[in-house]
A protein has these predicted regions:
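Surface-exposed amphipathic alpha-helices with a cationic face
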Residues: 18-25, 109
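Short glycine/serine/threonine-rich phosphate/pyrophosphate-binding segments
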Residues: 7-18, 97-105, 129
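Short beta-strand segments
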Residues: 7-9, 32-34, 119-123
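Predominant activation on well-ordered alpha-helical scaffold segments within soluble catalytic domains
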Residues: 15-18, 51, 80, 84, ...
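Active-site/ligand-binding loops adjacent to catalytic centers
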Residues: 22-96, 133-144
Length: 144
């Protein structure tokens, strides 16, 4: 494993999985995914973004002890587009935080050279978002 990439809400998943990754794969990187519009770990101010369940406007205490090596920013629009791609092309009915994680993992993989192993987590499901813009006009398979 070369890297683990995930967003954070409470910080529990990123901190806990990050510690386990470092124990098993000491050279692997643990990378936090943050909305580009609210990249708190990068020193930016909290702001509105559309990646539900991620970055609640503060850096949670659990994350302060996480073995983080880097951060990657994902724009809300890129998270939404990746989420829709996961629905359409792979049949994975996930929410935007999962789309953001996949987008970030692919970005990290592209920087690591040939054939990296980058792991992420699909941490939500789409049923929570049926009434949001995630399922707006033009997103259903029958509509193109």
């Amino acid at each position: 494993m070369d890297a683990f990439v995930a967003g954070y809400g409470t910080g529990g998943t990123l901190a806990g999985v990050g510690r386990a990754v470092k124990q098993r794969y000491p050279l692997a990187m643990v990378i936090a995914m943050e909305p580009a519009e609210a990249a708190l770990l990068c020193g930016e101010m909290p702001c509105c973004h559309s990646i539900e369940g991620v970055t609640g406007g503060f850096i949670p205490p659990l994350l302060r002890s996480a073995p983080l090596d880097d951060e990657v920013k994902v724009r809300s629009a890129d998270a939404l587009a990746m989420t829709r791609r996961l629905h359409r092309d792979f049949g994975l009915l996930v929410g935007t935080s999962s789309g953001a994680n996949v987008f970030a993992a692919l970005a990290v993989a592209s920087k690591l050279g040939p054939d990296p192993t980058v792991v992420t987590i699909l941490c939500d499901r789409a049923e929570r978002y049926f009434s949001t813009r995630l399922f707006g006009a033009g997103t259903l398979p029958s509509q193109g």
